[in-house]
Amino acid sequence: MQSMLCGRPVAADRQLIMAIVNRTPDSFYDRGATFSDEAARAAAHRAVAEGADVIDVGGVKAGPGQGVDVDTEIARLVPFIEWLRSAYTDLLISVDTWRAEVARLACTAGADLINDSWGGADPAMHEVAAELGAGLVCSHTGGALPRTRPFRVSYGTTTRGVVDDVIRQVTAAAERAVAAGVTRDSVLVDPTHDFGKNTFHGLLLLRHVDELVKTGWPVLMSLSNKDFVGETLGVGLTERLEGTLAATALAAAAGVRMFRVHEVVATRRVLEMVASIQGTRPPTRTVRGLA
């Protein structure tokens, strides 16, 4: 069963996987493994072969690091997106940027979805998405500026303050996007773990993820190998898969629509198992006790 998202066909009866392809030499997880054109193309081919529904292409490391100006970000993203669109004409392509100028050129090159992971830091982003007919991810950063780390972040005196703030901010941003002309069914919301949040905030958001789902806006979650997973389990960057997948299973069971991931195959298996437990997906084969 298929539906349309940002003008592209996607599965309607299961969660979607957004595979990460970083065009950066210093990304927090892969440390530049897909920075070269050849490596990035190979990663995209692999992700599609493994069942990714969306490819998310970023040109600037999320955290602090070497400065990247607009022209450099454009050079990293636009030619690759042009190639990706020519290679996969029906694939949903996402661009991860907080700069409206970059988003404009990326969408002109073939991107369908703007993953504005720094929560509207550029106020022109809604207008660009509307003008170009692109989808938009409305993210929550608690007011943090792009490429900064959280420091003594507070969301009030109640334990669920961050939950209320996330729901209030992302739903308001989604409504502003629609008012600007972005198609309602092309808007997603993202609580944006680790951005303007500490580990306790990340865990609370997962504990109450059903409340975000109940807003009616499709929810995107980027949990993959995040610091809140590492701090919760006391493990390093290369040992966060199990924690990521546990968080993914919980969020999937609550109804999260899309997951932004590094590991496509492992995530797909988790999502399929959750769906089978919930009764929305039949087992692949049933022999035990029947033959």
Curated annotation (Swiss-Prot):
One of its GO terms (molecular function) is dihydropteroate synthase activity. Residues 15-272 form the Pterin-binding domain. Signal peptide: none annotated. It comes from the Bacteria. PROSITE patterns: DHPS_1, DHPS_2, PTERIN_BINDING. One of its GO terms (biological process) is folic acid-containing compound biosynthetic process. The record marks 193 as: Characteristic for family members without dihydropteroate synthase activity. Pfam families: Pterin_bind. One of its GO terms (cellular component) is cytosol. Homodimer. Has very low affinity for the DHPS substrate 6-hydroxymethyl-7,8-dihydropterin-pyrophosphate, but can bind the inhibitor dapsone. Seems to lack dihydropteroate synthase activity, and does probably not function in folate metabolism. Belongs to the DHPS family. This is Inactive dihydropteroate synthase 2. The lineage of its organism: Bacteria, Bacillati, Actinomycetota, Actinomycetes, Mycobacteriales.
